[in-house]
Amino acid sequence: SPSYVNWVALRGFLVDGKSDTATKMWKEGLKIYPLSKADAPPSMEFINGSGKTFNTIHANNFKFYEELNQIVQREPIKLFSPEIRGQFASIGIQKGKPFNPDQRMKSILTDAVAVANATARATLWNERNSEEFLYDGSYWKRGYPGNNYQFLKDEGLGGRNLDARTMFYYFATVNTPMMAIELVGKGSQYAWGYLDSNGNFLDGSKNYKVNIPGDAPALKFWSMCVYDPQTRSMLQTNQPYPSKQSQRDTNMIVNEDGSVDLYYGPDAPEGMEANWTQTVPGKGWFVV
């Protein structure tokens, strides 16, 4: 990688609903060190991030450009192509030089980032591209419009779908071919949604039910996780996990046909607390 900072997402599966086996595997088997220290690699430091609060979204005001300038100054020049560096330089951001726009330029940039943020949100929440939906008549969406992790249209003949890329990275972070390639028994498949069966936005003050079929095609597990449309991070509620997961939540009530009814709303239906995920009145939500 040409970057000084690398971020790798690894997934360890639960065993008997617990993470102990995966934790042990990573702590004993994961070794990251400079090649210059291969003969005597330093000990790994593992930090438990559970229960901690992190701000993982970029600013949507003038501070966005200050964040961008920090990256340009910190990273090696080859991280960005000459074309991208030219765009940065056109607004006063260049490696080795101070970023100090005058009041006129600050005003222009502040307006620009507000419009850009609104455009990205509209692309995500009010799309007009039918390729984003799983099938005709469905309000469930796929992570990659056209199901291409490189956002290429018609296998590249139509170039790169820039709106699709903007949409994806506005609400997601990691990208891998295995989230798009359909291999039986391998990889992972994702669907997400923010509309109910009538096409209305999901409302945290209302109640909803989703049925997971007993023969859902999931070899390891299925999961339904609730997110906040403002932060695009997990919805903050009184529950430690705003989600239901078939490996972890073994106490869920299962129907006679093997299916599972999941409930969403501000309060749990009586007797179905194990199948309920809390939402926040006055706030929207979406599910992956």
Where are the model-predicted features located?
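A compositional/structural signature for long, glycine/proline-rich flexible linkers
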Residues: 1-288
